[in-house]
């Protein structure tokens, strides 16, 4: 199976890596084009474009200027160990055992505003470029127009005709995939908490749960919807009444 995750704004380039394996992103030419455009933006421009503080504008200006090819293990880091948000705390990639790294690599794909789509061990350098950023790139009015064809083609080339495809990304990122031309149906998973007498999606918990579901899929080498329905990490369980077809709901 394949599953897609969103990236994280929070990055970790300090923790010692559990593996020396790394690969190269398939869309580095496109990434380089975007970086050349970002290099022309001042810190103040970036703050306005991304609706971030002056300090973050300066940080990302510095990141853009420092970004350069070729990527090596000394100036870049495998994506799954570089992202550090709630999803990645749920995934906890640092504790995935060596004998499961191939399953991780074959299963997880990370959508990215700068890199398009990443395999877990694809090298990345620090950046910030959310998919929803209103950045005009040549004739493309935004990053969705810039990336949609390449991302969808890249996924289709990898997907088997009957392979399970699970969306664990946010709407902002999943919109970068053209589901009309994707060669397999999309399975979705939502995670709800019982609060004030009803079940609802709470963003912080839902993000962590997406990461935990990705970890579960790797741990169990999930291949079918029934495999996914067994997800029981951190108190979650599958809700048959709330689920419908390929839209799975897990509650706790």
Show which residues each predicted segment covers.
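Active-site helix-to-loop segments that bind/position phosphate- or nucleotide-bearing substrates
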Residues: 4-95
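Internal, well-folded beta-alpha domain core
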Residues: 93-243, 249
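Pocket-edge structural micro-motifs
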Residues: 5-7, 240, 252
């Amino acid at each position: 199976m394949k599953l897609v995750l969103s990236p994280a704004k929070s990055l970790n380039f300090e923790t010692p890596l559990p593996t020396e394996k790394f690969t190269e992103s398939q869309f580095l030419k496109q990434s380089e084009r975007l970086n050349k455009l970002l290099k022309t933006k001042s810190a103040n421009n970036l703050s306005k474009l991304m609706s971030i503080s002056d300090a973050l504008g300066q940080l990302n200006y510095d990141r853009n200027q420092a970004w350069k090819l070729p990527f090596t293990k000394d100036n870049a880091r495998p994506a799954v160990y570089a992202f550090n948000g709630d999803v990645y705390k749920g995934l906890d990639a640092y504790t995935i055992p060596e004998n499961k790294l191939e399953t991780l690599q074959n299963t997880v794909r990370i959508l990215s505003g700068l890199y398009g789509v990443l395999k877990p061990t694809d090298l990345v350098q620090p950046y910030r470029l959310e998919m929803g950023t209103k950045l005009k790139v040549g004739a493309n009015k935004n990053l969705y127009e810039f990336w949609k064809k390449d991302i969808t083609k890249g996924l289709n080339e990898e997907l088997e005709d009957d392979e399970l495809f699970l969306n664990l990304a946010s709407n902002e990122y999943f919109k970068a995939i053209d589901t009309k031309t994707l060669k397999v149906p999309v399975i979705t998973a939502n995670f709800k908490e019982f609060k004030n007498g009803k079940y609802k999606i709470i963003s912080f918990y839902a993000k962590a749960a997406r990461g935990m579901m990705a970890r579960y899929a790797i741990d169990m080498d999930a291949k079918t919807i029934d495999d996914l329905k067994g997800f029981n990490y951190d108190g979650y369980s599958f809700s048959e009444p709330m689920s419908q077809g390929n839209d799975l709901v897990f509650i706790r």
